[in-house]
Curated annotation (Swiss-Prot):
InterPro entries: CmoB, Mo5U34_MeTrfas-like, SAM-dependent_MTases_sf. Its EC number is 2.5.1.-. This is tRNA U34 carboxymethyltransferase. It holds the Pfam family Methyltransf_9. GO terms for molecular function: methyltransferase activity; transferase activity, transferring alkyl or aryl (other than methyl) groups. Keywords: Transferase, tRNA processing. Catalyzes carboxymethyl transfer from carboxy-S-adenosyl-L-methionine (Cx-SAM) to 5-hydroxyuridine (ho5U) to form 5-carboxymethoxyuridine (cmo5U) at position 34 in tRNAs.
C-alpha cells in the first residue's frame, strides 16, 4: 500500500503544516473504502525498482537508467505498466518505454506555460491531477513543491510507479482526495484546475474552494470547456456531452470570467482558446476505451455525437 508518512514529514515544517490536523485521519478513512483493484495496483507499485536514472522534466517526462534494461527486463516492465491501463494523460518516456497516453498533455502544457507567473520556488496545488503528468512538468520548471489531489486510486498508483522510475523524486506528491475534502489552507502560490470545472454540479463552489487554497495574490490557472456566446451563455447538457454523463455546466468565456469575479478573483483574463483535436486526444495501445473520434458526430466533427458544439477549451488566469 502507498505510504503517505514521508509527505507528512515533508510538510510538517512548511506553511502546509496545518493540513496535518485533518489529512492523516482522512487518508486512514480513504484506505478503508478503496477500489476493489487497489491492492492489485499497489502491488505493481511495490514491484517497481527504486532505480537511479538520468531525469528530464524540462521538455518531457523522461527517465534514462544509468544501466540500460535488458530485453527481458523491458518486456517485464512493459507488462507491469500495461496492468495499470488505461493511461490517459502523458506521454511518459520511462526506461526506454514510451507510454503513448490517450491525451497529449504536453500540447496543453505548451499552451499554458508561456502565460504563467514563473513557477520556480513556488508551492503548487494541482486539482484533478490525474496520473500527475503536469505535476512533473511543474517540477521541471523549478517548483519547490507540487501537491496533486485526485480521488482516483488508479491515478495514484500510476503516479507512484512513475515516481519510482524517476528516482523516487519527492518534489511532487499525489493525495487521493477531492478539493471539497481539503480544509482552507491559503498556502499555495499557484493553484491549477484543468479539466475539472465542467464535472462540478456547483461550479461557483468549486471556484471558491480553489480561492480558499491560494495565498493572497496567488495565481489561479483554470482550464475548462467553453462555448461561444455572451456573458449570459452557459450550456447545461440535457443528458450526456461527448458521451460523458458527468458534464454539468459549460459557460462562455465572458460568463466564466463573471463567475470568477463574483467569487472574488481579480485580474481575470483569458489567455488561450483551443478546439480539442484528434491529434491531442486519441486511442492508443495504452487505452482500450473509446476516445475523441468516437465522441464526435461522424459526419461533422464540429459537433459532439449528441449535437452540441465540439469540445473547445479555454485557459483563464486570475489572482486571489
Amino acid at each position: 500500500m502507498i505510504d503517505f508518512r514521508p509527505f507528512y514529514q515533508q510538510i510538517a515544517t512548511t506553511n502546509l503544516s496545518a493540513w496535518l490536523e485533518t489529512l492523516p485521519l482522512q487518508l486512514k478513512q480513504w484506505e478503508k473504502t478503496t477500489h476493489g483493484d487497489y491492492a492489485k495496483w499497489a502491488k505493481i507499485v511495490d514491484f517497481m525498482p527504486n532505480s537511479t536514472a538520468c531525469i528530464n522534466l524540462k521538455d518531457k517526462v523522461e527517465s534514462i537508467p544509468h544501466t540500460p534494461l535488458s530485453v527481458g527486463e523491458t518486456k517485464q516492465l512493459t507488462h507491469h505498466l500495461k496492468q495499470l491501463m488505461p493511461w490517459r494523460k502523458g506521454p511518459y518516456h520511462l526506461h526506454g518505454i514510451h507510454i503513448d497516453t490517450e491525451w497529449r498533455s504536453d500540447f496543453k502544457w505548451d499552451r499554458v506555460l508561456p502565460h504563467l507567473a514563473p513557477l520556480k520556488d513556488r508551492t503548487i496545488l494541482d486539482v484533478g491531477c490525474g496520473s500527475g503528468y503536469h505535476m512533473w512538468r511543474m517540477v521541471g520548471e523549478g517548483a519547490k513543491m507540487v501537491v496533486g489531489i485526485d480521488p482516483t486510486e488508479l491515478f495514484l498508483c500510476q503516479f507512484e510507479v512513475v515516481r519510482k522510475l524517476l528516482g523516487n523524486d519527492r518534489r511532487a506528491n499525489l493525495i487521493p482526495l477531492g478539493i471539497e475534502q481539503m480544509q482552507p489552507l491559503a498556502a499555495f502560490d499557484t493553484v491549477f484546475s484543468m479539466g475539472v470545472l465542467y464535472h462540478r454540479k456547483s461550479p461557483l463552489d468549486h471556484l471558491s474552494q480553489l480561492k480558499a487554497q491560494l495565498v493572497k495574490g496567488g495565481e489561479l490557472v483554470l482550464e475548462t470547456l467553453v462555448i461561444d456566446g455572451d456573458v449570459n451563455t452557459c450550456l447545461v447538457p440535457a443528458d450526456r456531452y461527448a458521451k460523458m454523463k458527468n458534464v454539468y455546466f459549460i459557460p462562455s468565456i465572458d460568463c466564466l470570467i463573471n463567475w470568477l469575479e463574483k467569487v472574488g478573483f481579480k485580474n481575470v483574463r483569458c489567455v488561450d482558446q483551443a478546439v480539442t483535436t484528434l491529434e491531442e486526444q486519441r486511442k492508443t495501445d495504452w487505452l482500450e476505451n473509446e476516445s475523441l473520434v468516437d465522441f464526435l458526430d461522424p459526419n461533422d466533427h464540429s459537433k459532439t455525437i449528441e449535437g452540441y458544439p465540439a469540445p473547445k477549451r479555454a485557459v483563464i488566469l486570475a489572482n486571489a
